[in-house]
Structure formats: structure tokens, C-alpha cells
Design a protein with these regions (language model features):
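Amphipathic alpha-helical segments
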Residues: 14-30, 87-97, 157-173, 223-233
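Short strand-coil-strand connectors
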Residues: 52-54, 182, 189-191, 256
Length: 270
């Protein structure tokens, strides 16, 4: 059903600055964008832009109502999943009990058909399904990102979150264990995508059951990417990657250099 993660969406109070950051840091190319009418994604309306780097994409959204947004941060907003046939997928997901924010998909400026889930049926977090146009976008010369491996979420109950993905998206638990932040984590694969679920050391401190936490970008070789990233002003939390509970090598960016948003490079096991 889900073929890949098309993009992570971010809220920003300054769209031009956010575009410039991706251009400078990841050699990204602006693929399109424009004004957005008030709607489910941004109730106040605003404007957006899509940036591409390697085989990855990000959607940047600048709302009219910027209450609670920091001028220094990218705030994770949603994840978009690619499906082959959006109408067939809507029928299948509706049969599983999911609801959507509109009766039918809309078409964005890039020609993508997309439809948001009603977040009341997705643990309060925003997700949408996307059908790409027949003419696939070519990868650009940005940072050599192969794909987005997962979106990460902080959750109040790891067991309940795992069960939700297994039951609703026919997921399978890949593995997990103690997290470096002092809690526990788990990786769940569903279709051809993955999610990382992180239960903090003090789950009661969370206000919501699910909160978007980070994105993981797959690269062919982390050490060779470090120098490329550092030449663009990015820094990392360590000199070398660590290996997580499912055999992935992971290295996080310092959030001081990634506009306050948590991102990491990932080298998948052979």
C-alpha cells in the first residue's frame, strides 16, 4: 500500500529563510509552491514550497497565523506517504476504519494527488496519502539522500503504539530496545515504509499520545557525507555514527545547525 515516504512537512514563520536553509545546507532545489487557501493542513491559510535534495523532498509551510511558532525553528507538521492508486487506497483504508479530512483528493502545484487523514483516526498526528504523476521527478545534485527511511514519533505507550501500527497498517515489529535518550524505542515496518516509535523515560511528561520527533535520511556512506555536510555549515552530535537496535548506523545533526529540527543520516545494514 505505502510505497515510500514522499516528504516530511514543516511549519516555518519565514518561508524564504527556510528555503534558503535547505538550499545552503543540502544543496536543495525549489520544485514549486505558492499561496494556500485556508484548509485542513493550514486553517489560517498561507503559502508553501517544495524543496528537493537527492531523492528526498520537504514541504515547507508558512501559515498566516504564526501563534506558537519560533523564528529559529522548523516545526514538524506532517508526513506524506506515496500510494500507487489513491482512490483504491482510500477505499481500503476506509474499510479499516480510517477517516479523511475531505471527500476526495486535491491536486497540488506539483501535480500530486493528495488526501489528508482525519487526525482523530491517526493518533492526533497529520499524515496524507499521495499519488504521484506519471512523469517521475528526477533526483537532483543535492546531498546524496537515497530516500527517507522513517518519521520518528515520541509516544506515551510504546506497546500501544506498536499495536496500533500492527493492527491498522498491517505492520510488523522489526526490533528496538533502550533509546539513547533514556527511554525505549521500536521500529515497525508497514508496506515499504517504516516508523520509529520512542517512549521517553517519563511518558507522563507528554501532553499528547503521539508527537513528531525526527526524520531519518538514508545515505550510502555516512563518513563520506559528514565532510560534505560540514562544508555546508552542518554539525553532528558525534564524530562517528552509532548502531541502533535494528542494525542501522545513525548520526544525528546538531539541532543548532538544523534549524532546531531533529534529523539524522542513516546507513542501512547490508
Amino acid at each position: 500500500m505505502f510505497e515510500k515516504i514522499q516528504h516530511i512537512g514543516y511549519l516555518t514563520p519565514d518561508l524564504d529563510r527556510a528555503i534558503a536553509w535547505f538550499e545552503e545546507s543540502f544543496n536543495a532545489v525549489k520544485a514549486g509552491g505558492g499561496p494556500l487557501n485556508p484548509g485542513y493542513a493550514m486553517p489560517s491559510g498561507g503559502r508553501n514550497a517544495y524543496v528537493r535534495f537527492g531523492n528526498a523532498e520537504a514541504e515547507l509551510l508558512e501559515p498566516v497565523d504564526q501563534t506558537g511558532l519560533s523564528s529559529e525553528f522548523l516545526t514538524m507538521h506532517h508526513v506524506g506517504y506515496v500510494v500507487a492508486d489513491i482512490n483504491k487506497t482510500i477505499d481500503e483504508l476506509t474499510a479499516r476504519g480510517f477517516k479523511f479530512a475531505a471527500d476526495k483528493p486535491n491536486v497540488n502545484v506539483l501535480g500530486h494527488q493528495l488526501l489528508y487523514f482525519d487526525s482523530r483516526t491517526t493518533n492526533g498526528v497529520k499524515m496524507h496519502i499521495t499519488q504521484l504523476p506519471d512523469a517521475a521527478a528526477e533526483p537532483n545534485d543535492g546531498l546524496e539522500i537515497e530516500r527517507i527511511i522513517h518519521a520518528g514519533y515520541r509516544v506515551k505507550s510504546l506497546e500501544e503504539a506498536i499495536k496500533w501500527y500492527v493492527d491498522n497498517f498491517k505492520g510488523s515489529l522489526l526490533g528496538g530496545g533502550p533509546s539513547r535518550s533514556g527511554g525505549r524505542n521500536a521500529f515497525v515496518n508497514f508496506s515499504q515504509v517504516q516508523v520509529e516509535l520512542i517512549e521517553p523515560g517519563d511518558p507522563a511528561s507528554m501532553g499528547d499520545d503521539h508527537v513528531m520527533d525526527h526524520v531519518g535520511y538514508v545515505v550510502g556512506d555516512i563518513p563520506s557525507c559528514i565532510g560534505q555536510c560540514e562544508s555546508h555549515g552542518l554539525k553532528f552530535v558525534s564524530d562517528t555514527p552509532n548502531t541502533n537496535g535494528v542494525g542501522q548506523q545513525v548520526l544525528y545533526f546538531e539541532t543548532d545547525t538544523s534549524m532546531g529540527s531533529r534529523m539524522h543520516l542513516t546507513r542501512l545494514p547490508d
